[in-house]
Amino acid sequence: MSPTSAASNGPSSVKPLTGPQKALHKLGLLRDIDLALHLPLRYEDETRLVKLRDVREGDLAQVEGRVTHAEVKLGGQRQLLVTLDDGTGTCLLRFFSFYPSLQTTLALGKQVRVRGEIRGGFAGLTMMHPVVKPAGGELATALTPVYPSVAGLPQTYLRRAVQAGLQRAELSDTVPPQYLQEIGLQPLWDMRKALSFLHNPTPDVSLAALQDHSHPAWQRLKAEELLAQQLSQLQARRARAQLRAPVLATPALSVPQVSVPNVSPKVWGEAAVAQAAVRDGHLTPLQTLAQRLLVALPFQLTAVQMRVVAEITQDIARPVPMHRLLQGDVGAGKTVVAALAAAVCMDAGWQCALMAPTEILATQHFAKLVGWLHPLGITVAWLTGSQKAKERRDMLALISSGQAELVVGTHALIQDKVQFKALALAIIDEQHRFGVAQRLALRSKMMSQAASQSEPASGVEPHLLMMTATPIPRTLAMSYYADLDVSTIDELPPGRTPIITKVVNEARRDEVIARIRGQIAQGRQIYWVCPLIEESEALDLTNATETHTQLSAALPGVMVGLLHSRMPAAEKQAVMRLFTSGQLGVLVSTTVIEVGVDVPNASLMVIEHAERFGLSQLHQLRGRVGRGAAASACVLLYSTGDAPRLGETARERLRAMAETNDGFEIARRDLEIRGPGEFMGARQSGDAMLRFADVNEDARLLDWARRTAPHMLDQSPALAAQHVQRWLGGKTDFLKA
């Protein structure tokens, strides 16, 4: 089958696919529009010939000349060495891999055309493995595109497939011209003209404008892509508004103004005053579960936390499903906000589920929620994959009967045997750690089981609260999360001591261990984190085990624990109990303690090979300390290995950690370093939404797309649907998760 029939808008052929056709599918090039939108990485200029006297080192040059010398050198590595003379100079052509046919093409006296990068050196001008053709052929009339590809997919085949897809694709304009006129893109560059130009640019165009995507043709595509993103998310938001959800109404969590010594409402907020008033006997609490929980808490909520609680409770009091993201820095107090939302749900006679990505984090949530809610008469169930059969049966019975009003667990919550009686609110912590399929499974389970005595299950969708300790920069919230309502806790609870972060060379490891001795002498505890080596679990385990052995020998009399991903769940829990209770002085761990672990007595975090960690991950790990009143520190141990110095990206990450504790600033810098696609992980394990636009560099176009989407959806719904289908196809499942 030819590349011209490798993709189409219709069903796939039943004939077996060839190697290149399989490669096209691997790239996701299934439709003609996919091929048309598969744009070049770069371009090569085959439209002109240059003279060797005019070239400089580093140039990509195309030269014609005569072969004046050719030999196969049989030294240490077999090479074909050819000298080319164009009358103005000579160039050495060097090939380390070649067939006899190439020797024939480059035989002495042959006239040839070669194209490649000019290099310098003791032999003079050199090309390594240039492209070779017979001389005298017609020159290209457009720049030659070089496309993203995979093994088994030659550029020549891919170019033909793309050109065929471009010819067949339906490329009529889907964006009304009046919208494009606002940004000066109509009628100069319609969709077909823009794509045709980018696949076949004329030789007089600025290569810089093509490479940095500032050319008007690129602007047209980026504007359309951003508009498709905004339309798809607005469609998702409006579709949810048509669904029914349980109404979880409760009296507002506000209290009468009272005066309590040493507690200022301006500083702490009304809720904190009420908490103090109840404890001091000044006020009788309201009798809703949420109010009783609020006043029974052993700490005072901030005004920001209360504002976020109000946003959530207003959402779940409506008959449409909430779809809200709660973001806050490490230790900002998101769990208590979730607990108050759960209390409102349970007050209304419904069940709530909280799903966490790891058993350690789920265990911590369970312990905390039991401590807060059990004294108030609430049954909290616990469900994980490692439970023993009897305990699991007991938990499943509590859940299905409705006796368990709150269920905490891992992905075990989405298994088929788990049957809720009346589930109305799902809370997903560290939602980015779950794949889209897992989040969709929980949502599907919620929809099938959202029922109560007073309301049939059919058509009822539960409320969804997602939480993340990885703050999302504003530009990404406006683009990748435009379908969600976002609540932000942008301040830490009072009493937190800022963490001092030091970047230390591995050569000073003994000094770090000496500092650990000092912390132990003061009764403090220490984390020592080893990097998770994805390529080898065995190497990961060896690394952590060796560090554990070394620290145990260097710290006689100190209990040093070991925690890693390959340990059975029961052993992990036992180690964490020892550390939480203070019996372990040092905990050597891989990144299984990255999120959620809360031990206020831990005051020092040492991260080994910090240069291997991402910036967000480093910040999450640092957040395990600084949770008590004691001064806390984070030591970033780095090693350059065999290199003379750290790479620039690693230096930027470590520098950012040393300069700020602010998670929102960390997120901004992380976005700068990695770019939106990698930062988001394609909306956390979903399909990527932006291939061409950059939400930072294209802020003007993003603002236009945000303003245009609602107008287009209202005034031209058919065109809006066609536009989303063209750009995203079926890649919108994650909007439901």
Can you annotate each of these PLM segments?
Residues 1-30:
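Helix-hairpin-helix
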Residues 18-23, 31, 248-257, 273-326:
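Conserved pre-motif I regulatory segment
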Residues 38-68:
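OB-fold nucleic-acid-binding modules
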Residues 57, 73-260, 267-268, 273-296, ...:
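Upstream accessory/linker segments immediately N-terminal to the RecA-like ATPase cores of bacterial MutS
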Residues 89-102, 139-156, 180, 207-217, ...:
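Short hinge/gating elements
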Residues 304-310, 317-655, 665, 707, ...:
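Inter-lobe coupling/hinge segments of SF2-like helicase ATPases
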Residues 633, 641-737:
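C-terminal accessory region of SF2 helicases/translocases
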